[in-house]
Amino acid sequence: MEAKAVLRNTPTSPRKMRLVAGLVRGKQVNQAKAILLNSTKAASKNVMLTLKSAVSNYTLNNPDERVSDQELFVKAIFVDGGMTLKRTLPAPMGRAYRIRKRSNHLTIVVDKVKNPVIN
């Protein structure tokens, strides 16, 4: 049984967040945490928080099951565009440039590995 966690309106552009999401897609949770801890991207902190929340949701939804991070994997992770704040920047000759401050919605789904390989 899978569990899901959603982080909404994160003040990071979706393009930057998708770079980090691609690093952990399909990985086991313990591997994904190690990758995110060593990543230099600012978005990796938000992905780590959402991943921990998804694992916690899995344990709460399945109280009779005891699972470790090795037994769970990132089944799906996707980033959607959130709301865009529109701001103006004064430009030469009385004009104004538009600045778009983008945000995103991050969704992570974790599930149990069918045949776990334990080292």
UniProtKB/Swiss-Prot annotation:
Gene, per the UniProt record: rplV
Assembly information from the UniProt record: Part of the 50S ribosomal subunit.
GO CC list: cytosolic large ribosomal subunit
Higher taxonomy: Bacteria, Pseudomonadati, Chlorobiota, Chlorobiia, Chlorobiales
InterPro entries: Ribosomal_uL22, Ribosomal_uL22_bac/chlpt-type, Ribosomal_uL22_bac/org-type, Ribosomal_uL22_sf
Function description: This protein binds specifically to 23S rRNA; its binding is stimulated by other ribosomal proteins, e.g. L4, L17, and L20. It is important during the early stages of 50S assembly. It makes multiple contacts with different domains of the 23S rRNA in the assembled 50S subunit and ribosome.
Keyword Protease found: no
PANTHER family the record matches: CHLOROPLAST 50S RIBOSOMAL PROTEIN L22-RELATED, LARGE RIBOSOMAL SUBUNIT PROTEIN UL22M
GO molecular function: rRNA binding; structural constituent of ribosome
Any one of the GO BP annotations: translation
Family: Belongs to the universal ribosomal protein uL22 family.
Descriptive protein name: Large ribosomal subunit protein uL22
Keywords recorded for this protein, A-Z: Ribonucleoprotein, Ribosomal protein, RNA-binding, rRNA-binding
Pfam families: Ribosomal_L22 (PF00237)
